[in-house]
Amino acid sequence: MDETIKLSRSTVEKYLNCPRCCVLDKKHKIKPPSLPFTLNIAVDNLCKNEFDYYRDRQESHPLFIEHNIDAIPFKHKDIDTWRSNFKGIRFKSTEHNYDFGGAVDDVWQKKNGELIIVDVKSTSRNNFDWFETFNKYDYAKAYKRQLEMYQW
């Protein structure tokens, strides 16, 4: 197979949930129907605009201060590419013939230069317990895998 296989977090999740669906998508370009996520897209854009405001000023967001996150939104010429669907951050392996990537929601930088990859999730629950959610719902495990993939 000479063609480079493009992989993403959603490709991995698709394979884990339905290997056949993944092969149909990647090899034959047959995609399952999808639903629009207009609320998620709106929340995503609001968060990006909010972080961009503080990125331009190179200041910590008030929530960072409130929750003791010693970081500021990372200012980089490629931030819009990294946050763009179908571009995003990428890792290409010519040895294994794959191109892995995904769009991040944001990148923050600590004072020591360390970068924090951010993926914003929203919930309608007033009291959110990550550990309870992680142990109870598979989607939470997918979110954890997503961040682990971006760390890689």
What positions do the PLM features span?
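Acidic-basic catalytic patches of nuclease active cores, encompassing PD-(D/E)XK
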Residues: 43-88
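Charged, glycine-rich intrinsically disordered N-terminal tails and low-complexity linkers that flank
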Residues: 1-62
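Context-gated lysine
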Residues: 6-9, 14, 26-31, 48, ...
